[in-house]
């Protein structure tokens, strides 16, 4: 379902834990990390789509979270042609998104990456609030910055979270489909190093070293990074 300008209605999800860290998921079989997101089906409200995607992608139910806030308007990004399937090029332009900020009311063990037959992620971690800006694929970065900045106003009562993307960052070990495992630690990768680790066709986004987890399955170079 596209609007007249070629944008697909979509929801994005920023899930917080008790420390105001955000859920950060590794796309299955790839080196790329992102927030949960997905299209709004015909007849769905953004909130209904958010709860559906929340369960499909990370296995959580409405009782496991509470809504803290959402963006006021649609946030748009265009997708480069190399990430668009050939049959829809010329019609599909990108995504327009409503972003939801959720607070985890359940426990980490409530997160299930295999809740459906078509999982989106094969590992996940809690990351500091602004870390995704350093790791997300470039064409999504402006939307991530707009969403994180707009929704950060709901964090003003929680001084542990820097209210700018230039604060101190950190990360915890990542959780795989079958448990927890830590990635290499150390300084963040330079852009040159990140480029070397990306897939040859440029379809992968590479996190910093503190966020890196080896894929559990072979890397796919045919999937779009724009689900």
Curated annotation (Swiss-Prot):
Pfam families: NUDIX. The gene is rppH. Residues 217-227 have a biased composition (Polar residues). It is an enzyme of class 3 (hydrolase). This is RNA pyrophosphohydrolase. The keyword Transmembrane helix does not apply. Belongs to the Nudix hydrolase family. RppH subfamily. Gene3D superfamilies: Nucleoside Triphosphate Pyrophosphohydrolase. The keyword Hydrolase applies.
């Amino acid at each position: 379902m596209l609007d007249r300008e070629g944008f697909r209605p979509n929801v994005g999800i920023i899930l917080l834990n008790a420390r105001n860290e955000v859920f950060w998921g590794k796309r299955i079989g790839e080196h790329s990390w992102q927030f949960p997101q997905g299209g709004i089906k015909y007849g769905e409200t953004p909130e209904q789509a958010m709860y559906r995607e929340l369960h499909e992608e990370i296995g959580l139910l409405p009782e496991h979270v509470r809504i803290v806030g959402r963006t006021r308007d649609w946030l748009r990004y265009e997708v480069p042609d190399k990430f668009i399937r050939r049959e829809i090029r010329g019609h599909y332009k990108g995504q327009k998104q409503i972003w939801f900020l959720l607070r985890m009311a359940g426990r980490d063990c409530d997160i299930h990456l295999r809740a459906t037959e078509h999982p989106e992620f094969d590992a996940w971690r809690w990351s500091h609030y602004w870390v995704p800006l350093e790791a997300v694929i470039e064409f999504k970065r402006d939307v991530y910055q707009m969403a994180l900045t707009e929704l950060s106003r709901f964090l003003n009562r929680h001084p542990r979270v820097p209210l700018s993307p230039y604060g101190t960052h950190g990360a915890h070990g990542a959780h795989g489909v079958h448990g927890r495992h830590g990635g290499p630690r150390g300084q963040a990768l330079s852009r040159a190093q990140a480029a070397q680790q990306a897939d040859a066709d440029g379809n992968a986004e590479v996190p910093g070293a503190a966020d890196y987890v080896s894929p559990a399955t072979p890397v796919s170079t045919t999937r779009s990074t724009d689900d």
